[in-house]
Design a protein with these regions (language model features):
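Short glycine/serine/threonine-rich phosphate/pyrophosphate-binding segments
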Residues: 108-115, 136-137, 254
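Active-site segments that bind and position negatively charged phosphate/pyrophosphate groups
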Residues: 201, 205-321
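C-terminal charged capping/lid subdomain of soluble metabolic enzymes
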Residues: 3-5, 185-187, 287-371
Length: 371
């Protein structure tokens, strides 16, 4: 039996369904929301081979006409070129304003598809069916859509809410271990922001979650989605406290950009390191006990998440000044200053604009120098 959460945004409110077996029931759950019984499904080559038939059979049973497109997997797909080709495919399929777009995949597919839906015919409805832990607990909820540019990650996009989110816990069993761990970093984030009891629960049950325990996975996804739904309902456009959800992401986006969005560092892995850097900076500024940084590092290390910078492809090396240069492109820059998400301890994140450049550079230099 699935659990249902609500994102309370007035006339744009929507439900998040979390549970097992949702993919086979997707057609029945989607049908009442459709202006016309027609959807356009966007997925990637990985999900096509694993789950697309199940979704299409469910849509067929519900009498929903379905077309779609299959894109290459990976962060490189989240760019202008693929946005253009996706919009062309939607127009070639004669999508109308009554056609609902279904994002069926991980964060890349969800972000790209949501952005395409927001601009196609000046906005058509879309539904999220996230297939990774990262997308189930984070990117599918809240309406952030977008693509990457050569200047940085997610710098072109829109706030555009889905009509429904279906998070089927069963599909997580087909994730590669590295992908599952990458998503787990975003789960940890919710404990670090304002839920120390959840972080303590993760210390006890995180390994079971990664090893396939359905109860642990369901609890983690529900807790994470509930936390994000509360924040989004209170601050949809990130004018204030929603920025707390970016804990670790200012550092992470710099790491990803400098790493070329390649296989050296997945998004969740960058977030894991970024959260450690944020806690490290907080400790150096005298804001956070060093014991909390050590506790976070121990937990991430115990679950095989990175606690040091990985080697880059041959011919490239990490550089603290190069990493710092990416901070100026962060979406949280205001009047030329970055708003950092720091912490007074586990479960005590807060926003801070009074951070010295030299302090940030010192953190980056130490991390680059680590073996």
């Amino acid at each position: 039996m699935a659990s249902v959460l609500s994102v309370a945004l007035g006339e744009r409110s929507y439900e998040i369904h979390v549970g097992a077996g949702l993919l086979a029931r997707a057609g029945a759950l989607i049908r009442p929301l459709l202006a016309s019984p027609r959807v356009f499904v966007v997925t990637d080559e990985t999900i096509e081979g694993l789950h697309l038939d199940t979704l299409k059979e469910s849509l067929d049973r519900a009498g929903i006409e379905n077309h779609g497109v299959v894109l290459p997997p990976g962060e490189q797909t989240k760019d202008f070129a693929h946005l253009e080709s996706l919009l062309d495919a939607m127009l070639d399929a004669r999508c109308e304003r009554g056609t609902t777009i279904v994002a069926f995949g991980g964060g890349v597919i969800g972000d790209l598809t949501g952005f395409a839906a927001s601009v196609l015919l000046r906005g058509v409805p879309f539904i999220q069916i996230p297939t990774t832990l990262l997308s189930q607990v984070d990117s599918s909820v809240g309406g952030k859509t977008g693509i990457n540019t050569r200047q940085g990650k997610n710098l072109v996009g829109s706030f555009y809410q889905p009509r429904l989110v279906l998070a089927d816990i069963d599909v997580l069993s087909t994730l590669a271990p590295r992908d599952l761990r990458s998503g787990y970093a975003e789960v940890v984030k919710y404990g670090l922001i304002d839920d120390p009891a959840f972080f303590a629960w993760l210390e006890q049950h995180g390994l079971a979650l990664l090893l396939g325990n359905a109860e642990a996975r369901t609890h983690a996804v529900l807790t994470s989605c509930a936390a994000k739904a509360r924040v989004v309902a209170a601050d949809e456009k990130e004018s204030g406290q929603r920025a707390l959800l970016n804990l670790g992401h200012t550092f992470a986006h710099a790491l990803e950009a400098e790493g070329g969005y390649g296989e050296a560092l997945q998004h969740g892995e960058a977030v894991a390191i970024g959260m450690l850097m944020a806690f490290d900076l907080s400790v150096r500024m005298g804001l956070c006990p060093a014991a909390d940084l050590a506790r976070l590092e121990a937990h991430l290390k115990a679950l095989a998440l990175p606690v040091a910078l990985p080697p880059l492809p041959e011919g490239k090396a990490w550089s603290a000044p190069a990493l710092l240069s990416h901070f100026a492109k962060d979406k949280k820059v205001k009047d030329g200053k970055v708003t950092f998400v720091l912490a007074r301890g586990i479960g005590q994140a807060f926003l801070c604009r009074e951070v010295e450049r030299a302090q940030v550079l010192a953190v980056l230099e130490d991390w680059v120098a680590r073996p």
